[in-house]
Amino acid sequence: MALDIDYVLSHISQEDKIALLAGIDFWHTHPIPELNVPSIRSTDGPNGIRGTKFFAGVPAACLPCGTALASTWDQNLLREVGVLIGKECLAKGAHCWLGPTINMPRSPLGGRGFESFAEDPHLAGAMAASMITGCESTGVISAVKHFVGNDQEHERRAVDVLVTQRALREIYLRPFQIVARDAGPGALMTSYNKINGKHVVESKEMLDMVRQEWKWNPLIMSDWLGTYTTIDSMNAGLDLEMPGPSRYRGRYVESALQARLIKESTIDSRARKVLEFVQQASRAPVSAVETGRDYPEDRALNRNLCANSIVLLKNQNDILPLPKTIKKIALVGSHVRTPAISGGGSASLEPYYTVSLYDAVSEALPHTEILYEVGAYAHKMLPVIDRLLTNAVMHFYNEPVGTERILRATQRMSKTAFQLMDFNAPELNRGLFYATLTGDFTPDVSGVWDFGLTVFGTGLLYVDDELVVDNTTHQTRGTAFFGKGTVQELGSKTLNAEQTYKIRIEYGSANTSPMKAIGVVHFGGGAAHLGACLHVDSAEMVRSAVKAAAEADYTILCTGLNHEWESEGFDRSHMDLPPGIDALITSVLDVAANKTVIVNQSGTPVTMPWADRARGIVQAWYGGNETGHGIADVIFGDVNPSGKLPLSWPVDVKHNPAYLNYASVGGRVLYGEDVYVGYRYYEKVGREVLFPFGHGLSYTTFTVSPDVVFSQEVFRPEEPPTAAVKIKNTGKVAGAQVLQLYISAPHSPTPRPTKELHGFTKVLLQPGEERVAHIRMDKYATNFWDEIEGMWKSEEGIYEALIGTSSQNILAKGTFRVDRTRYWLGL
């Protein structure tokens, strides 16, 4: 679209100019129809495009989580993923994708760790840049996030991140710096938190770094409800407050202008940037209505992506791949029939479909007898009862139950979990409303059923008009719904199979709750989760699983975490698997260790006290729509695993360098590990990990020549050398290997990590094939942040280039030199 920005600015009213600086609703910018300025739509999330609705949304493609994407170490593949993200945005009528997330998972406990890419800033930045390039090739703008330091969820709006300038530059800002240099996305989202005493959204120092030092000029938008002031945020450089209606702009900007606390030129500058964003975004050929686009080629890409993200952690005695001639196989675990396709929070969406491991194994082994047992549940809340519920409908009112009420809206329901943060209806009071959900529930098994109701608001559950759960006055804050919900309140009732019961929930919106919380984001209308299951005997479930494993030729035990354990809004309190899972795994290994493969699904590391006893361990992350197919493709050898860990896997959470400095204490968190994040710390102090950064096995074998050959012996930042080694597939099947280039400065007088990743390449080789692999060093390979000079410094001297297949498996070495010490700023 042709938008004459100068003309608009010269003909626009002051009121409309200021209105441009905030959204009009949850997802849209302010339009000016008389000057042909359209409204621009943005949308979540990090692993799929939800569209404009958390509640009753249009289905979408669900991609593997961020750590899964990074574990491919495949920039070309992530470019394809970015294109798919862009196309999904267009189908949802969205011009701007709120992603990717490139914060640093300094601790395995971070609630959004699964959204991020890697503990290493080079890997995170490179993978994000590829994804952004793909997305923006479709015309959709990427809003990379969260700038910067939103590395925990605890009190994320209030916490003050205390971090040295060196760590800030070398670790936490570096991914954004790489993205700015290699992709230059059109938008940047600020974080909720403070950095060294100042909210980022109000920090002129931080935002000037982007525009002045880096010469990158994106639209800078706030995170949702992450604007806290009028004057400071305007003067710092925040262009767009989201969402709308505005809380800190509008008439407050007018008042500040009259008091000369904000200059008119500042308003013009912010409005110009918003109009530039509108001009760029409006060129995208978006759909007029939100639609789906579930195409075969997208399914194939998603399946390939899931399989290539899987990391083979352990394969003792080559237990994998499993033969397809198995006569009897046991499938054990909570994730076998209910795959964990994504984490929670902004990553949540309604998927087009899901493929379970049970379905995928049934397809792969059509003539094999399958023994299925849950063994132990992995859910935090009782599972939803969607498949047992019919005729469900929700009615909305402004008045509470028991009073004379006028129906304001009706919504057909297919789920017993809902979030109403962006729900709206004519004449419905969004600040305070009530709803009644009714439906027919037909249990499939007779016995005592446990019901659980979790709310952000208030709720009463009735079964055939009998009150079963009261979650109204005696509420305890839990972790659900971005950290704002209650813990689950429970009740029980004896039910008969195949008999239909009337389910009714009397719900009150968020403001009916007596709970108040500091540091969490308060989104709109609230939420609820109704779950139920037959009251179970945990010991009997384990015994049944052990019996199946003992009888089977092989056992696949698939379990782990899910969106209830890893989510935006809260952090994990420990690194353990859900209660009962370790005991289940140990019991199965007691009878079938030599024929059992453990498949773990989580977005970040979990403790594995049984790891030394397991012959096969597979890390399957949150795999998206094609989770089951991806896992089965690897387990049965249709895909040779090539994934590599983007995170170090500690034995115990206490070994993590952030263990003593995680979560907000007294309103602040100290990044005491400084630049020694992840493998940088473990290597520096000699701490053993369960699996190192970059680790991942294959069904084939490779050899790598021992000497690194350089395109030039002298390193110059303006023309970094290329490192080369020979690599050969010495096995019997085709496979891909990731060669990782680490740089070491052993003679530097400045304390530095033992080595740091500064390049990588993924090489696919046929059996017997040999090739020379070239890895171009990063411009930043030899530098560190000099806090005295306030600049990057590359010291004169001899450096080592180390190439390996993990941070601990170095196979080739070489040396190069920097001929003189240099200082610099910028990209």
UniProtKB/Swiss-Prot annotation:
It is found in: Secreted. Keywords: Carbohydrate metabolism, Cellulose degradation, Glycoprotein, Glycosidase, Hydrolase, Polysaccharide degradation, Secreted. One of its GO terms (molecular function) is beta-glucosidase activity. It holds the Pfam family Glyco_hydro_3_C. Disulfide bonds: none annotated. Beta-glucosidases are one of a number of cellulolytic enzymes involved in the degradation of cellulosic biomass. Catalyzes the last step releasing glucose from the inhibitory cellobiose. This is Probable beta-glucosidase H.
